[in-house]
Amino acid sequence: WSPQQDSALKAVSAWLKDRDGPQVFRLFGWAGTGKSTLAVHLAQDVRNVKFAAFTGKAALVMRKRGCKGAQTIHSLIYTLVSEKDGEPRFVLDDESPAADADLIVIDEVSMVDEQLGRDLLSFGVKVLVLGDPFQLPPVQGAGFFTADEPDMMLTEIHRQAADNPIIHLSMQVREGGFLERGRY
């Protein structure tokens, strides 16, 4: 682990052990800083962990990175009760797997709006949220978890991601640089 990642591991571990501490830990960082890798490592010491993301594609990426059983937040905490005029109607499922979890890990949290965030927290389970505060926000209604400052902010890009051209260009812009015309 890098020194920054090691600090994050220690901070999240201390938060997990503190039963009277805050329900949410915000582990934020740029793409390629190892947020998902840290979450998978931390989950190894927790009995019942549920992984979720706002979109199915993000949940698939989580599964590919070792987050076993990652699913959408909606499928984790809601149940379909009816369809009216062809539109599905979902309600919070008090007996969802989230109710029995010791930890819920949510990735791509910039997409989570207030209602979804409050519903997620209603289970009373510790929630580790992962996100990039520099990610473009959705058009409306999100930012429930990103409105507050992160508990830990990872800024060091690691070797696996450092050669990624998208990450390289985003870092260039983030640091005030300009993109040259050309093909990328």
Language-model segments: residues:
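Conserved ATP-binding/catalytic motifs of P-loop helicase motor domains
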Residues: 1-184
